[in-house]
Amino acid sequence: MSEPKTSATSETQTGTMTVKTGLAQMLKGGIIMDVINADQARVAEEAGACAVMALEKVPADIRKDGGVARMADPRKIKEIMDTVTVPVMAKCRIGHFAEAQILQNLGVDFIDESEVLSPADDENHVDKQPFNVPFVCGARSLGEALRRISEGAAMIRTKGEAGTGNVVEAVRHARQINREIRVAQCLSSAELYGYAKQLGVPLDLLQKTAKLGRLPVVNFAAGGLATPADVSLLMQLGVDGVFVGSGIFKSGNPEKRAKAMVQAVTHYNDPKVLADVSEDLGDPMVGLNCEHLSEKWAQRESVHKS
């Protein structure tokens, strides 16, 4: 049995929010790819991914197969960690602090408390503050984002609708967060107090967000990105990087598409480069219309707002 991975997120170096958010800052301008085995992890790293997300199944297969989706097998996570040198993330269920404790013990670099897996607690998210490993959490709105940050999340991503190959929900969530930040910037101190109560978030976090004009932590896009153009669209909307899951390894040419997606993150403002890297990528993953989904994963959040 291999020893837990020694990484930048070892216990002696982490624990404070400043350190954890600093580790997330190192991923800015990058792409994080979902992988289910060592071979896929190798493809992702060789393509230029800044990190990989270790999963039992990609989101498209989770949707297709149904049932309860849980944390990946620790052996699979360790195999992926032993294969690549880039940071390795892994998902735990919403509210499942025991899964998070196991993942921290394995030595993963980040934990994603994810709505893609079946929620374990419909009233509480994991208290992320005591953990030494940084957490990633999804958000559809400024309120959701700041609630997760108040719980200790060091990185936010749009929820989108993973496994659909349809970017519409990720765009909606990115625009919603941007819109609500602009509203906050226009409010007086007294009005911000009322807005914080309306959103169900700590006043100090809302004040900091209004002053910065952006979330106080790294904000990536996720959920349904399947083409270089999708990546460019979200980057131009102001996110710091992207997660891509089923869109790569459910496509006709994963190796070429992975490299193209990496180029799209770097050259998101250059239509010529985007056109070049978009050529001959093979068939994209088969997409789903989000309005026809029987359940939207993005709606999975604990009921408490404080």
Swiss-Prot record:
Locate the coiled-coil region(s) and give their ranges. none
Q: Mind listing the UniProt keywords for this protein, alphabetically? A: Lyase, Pyridoxal phosphate, Schiff base
Q: Does the keyword Lyase apply?
A: yes
Molecular function in Gene Ontology: pyridoxal 5'-phosphate synthase (glutamine hydrolysing) activity
Induction context:
By ethylene, a major product of degradation of oceanic dissolved organic carbon by photochemical reactions initiated by sunlight.
Q: Which reaction does it catalyse?
A: aldehydo-D-ribose 5-phosphate + D-glyceraldehyde 3-phosphate + L-glutamine = pyridoxal 5'-phosphate + L-glutamate + phosphate + 3 H2O + H(+)
One GO biological process this protein is involved in is: amino acid metabolic process
Locate the active site: 91 (schiff-base intermediate with d-ribose 5-phosphate)
Family the UniProt entry places it in: Belongs to the PdxS/SNZ family.
- Free-text function comment from the UniProt entry: Catalyzes the formation of pyridoxal 5'-phosphate from ribose 5-phosphate (RBP), glyceraldehyde 3-phosphate (G3P) and ammonia. The ammonia is provided by PDX2. Can also use ribulose 5-phosphate and dihydroxyacetone phosphate as substrates, resulting from enzyme-catalyzed isomerization of RBP and G3P, respectively. Also plays an indirect role in resistance to singlet oxygen-generating photosensitizers.
Database matches in PANTHER family: PYRIDOXAL 5'-PHOSPHATE SYNTHASE SUBUNIT SNZ1-RELATED (PTHR31829:SF0)
Instruction: Report what the protein is called.
Output: Pyridoxal 5'-phosphate synthase subunit SNZERR
What is the organism of origin for this protein? Suberites domuncula (Sponge)
